[in-house]
Amino acid sequence: MMSSIAAPKLKEKVEKFLSGKKKMYINGSFVESASGKTFDTPNPATGERLATVYEGDAEDIDRAVKAAREAFD
């Protein structure tokens, strides 16, 4: 016999934080993706949208790698 439990309700502060688009952290700053594209991430407990995040691409990877190299040089 399988049983299930209800997914816990997110706290108000967490919901508020997740409500906006989540930026990428590159070179000490939170930035949007170069393309401006986003995608939704699901809550694994409910399948509902948990957050919207910026979708990084090759240009964003290049910016992050360049910043990392400069930090270590």
UniProtKB/Swiss-Prot annotation:
GO function terms (MF aspect): aldehyde dehydrogenase (NAD+) activity
InterPro entries linked: Ald_DH/histidinol_DH, Ald_DH_N, Aldehyde_DH_dom
Pathway this chain belongs to: Alcohol metabolism; ethanol degradation; acetate from ethanol: step 2/2
Superkingdom classification of source: Bacteria
SUPFAM superfamilies given in the database record: ALDH-like
Entry keywords, A to Z: NAD, Oxidoreductase
Catalytic activity, reaction form: an aldehyde + NAD(+) + H2O = a carboxylate + NADH + 2 H(+)
Statement: the UniProt record of this protein carries the keyword Oxidoreductase: yes
GO biological process, one term: ethanol catabolic process
EC number: 1.2.1.3
Similarity annotation: Belongs to the aldehyde dehydrogenase family.
Entry protein name: Aldehyde dehydrogenase
